[in-house]
Structures are given as structure tokens and as C-alpha cells.
């Protein structure tokens, strides 16, 4: 499964450390190692390398698998970074986190595919993190159900919660 996350408007230049949106996103992703994180941007043209971007958000580090950009004018078809990446990776399951003011193309794409779209009116705050966590749980469960590959919920020898 791929999680598309708007880098420039939800992560870049925001508070860093334990209270920032990158740390909040890392915490949400922790239980889901099978989720590939792809950062998106609104400008035209290639983004810096994955290693450069990892340096900008060290809280996410190796969780960043790829960076995607819009291949056309930034005000047209903003969802193309998603459709292009899905075609290239042949991935069916995805979710996206985008700011409210840039949601029109994403809403249409998510509606067509049934993918969850987390809209952020106030940045990637706690409320958005909770909505993302619930969406990831649903999508990962569905992906595992369809593929027949289930991750163990607990390691051998680990105590189960009462």
C-alpha cells in the first residue's frame, strides 16, 4: 500500500521534533511497516532526491520510499502524481493526505478508486493523524484480506493485551 503525503504544505518548514507533523506521521506509520510513504509536491518539476528529503524530515528517515511531482502545470490535474506513481508501481491500495485547499482532483481520484483521502484544514494536526490511523487500519486490513498475507499481530513470546 502507498501513502501519498503532501510534503511542501504539510511537512516542509513546519515544527520539527516530537511535536511536529513529521513526528506525528512517523507515530501513525509505526504499526504499518508495509505502508510505503511517497511525498508529493505541488510545484512542477522534479523534487530533490529521496536522501535530500530524508534530511529535511529526519523523523521519517527511511520510511520515505519515493518523492513524486506534478508533470504538468501545478494548477491542473493535481492528482497526476498519484496516478503516475500507481501506474509505475502497479499498486492498487493507497491513501492520500492533502490540504483542503488543493483537494478537488484528489477527491475525484479517491472517489473513483475507493481510496481514503485525509483532508487537512489546519495542517497535519492530531485530528488528521487520528483519521489517517483509522484509514490505514482499514486499507491494510483489506489488502491483507485480498492478498491472503496476514502479518502477525504479536511476536511469539509477547504478551497479549487483556
Task: Show the residue positions of the predicted features.
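Alpha-helical substrate-recognition element adjacent to the catalytic core
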Residues: 2-76
Amino acid at each position: 500500500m502507498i501513502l501519498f503525503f503532501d510534503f511542501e504544505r504539510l511537512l516542509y518548514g513546519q515544527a520539527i521534533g516530537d511535536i511536529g507533523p513529521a513526528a506525528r506521521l512517523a507515530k501513525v506509520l509505526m504499526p504499518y511497516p508495509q505502508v510505503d510513504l511517497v511525498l508529493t509536491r505541488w510545484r512542477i518539476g522534479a523534487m530533490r532526491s529521496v536522501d535530500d528529503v530524508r534530511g529535511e524530515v529526519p523523523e521519517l528517515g527511511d520510511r520515505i520510499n519515493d518523492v513524486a511531482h506534478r508533470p504538468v502545470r501545478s494548477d491542473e490535474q493535481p492528482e497526476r502524481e498519484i496516478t503516475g506513481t500507481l501506474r509505475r508501481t502497479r499498486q492498487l491500495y493507497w491513501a492520500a493526505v492533502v490540504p483542503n485547499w488543493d483537494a478537488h482532483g484528489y477527491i475525484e481520484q479517491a472517489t473513483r478508486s475507493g481510496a481514503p483521502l485525509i483532508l487537512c484544514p489546519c495542517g497535519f494536526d492530531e485530528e488528521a493523524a487520528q483519521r489517517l490511523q483509522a484509514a490505514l487500519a482499514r486499507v491494510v486490513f483489506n489488502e491483507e484480506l485480498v492478498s491472503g498475507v496476514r502479518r502477525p499481530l504479536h511476536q511469539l513470546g509477547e504478551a497479549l493485551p487483556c
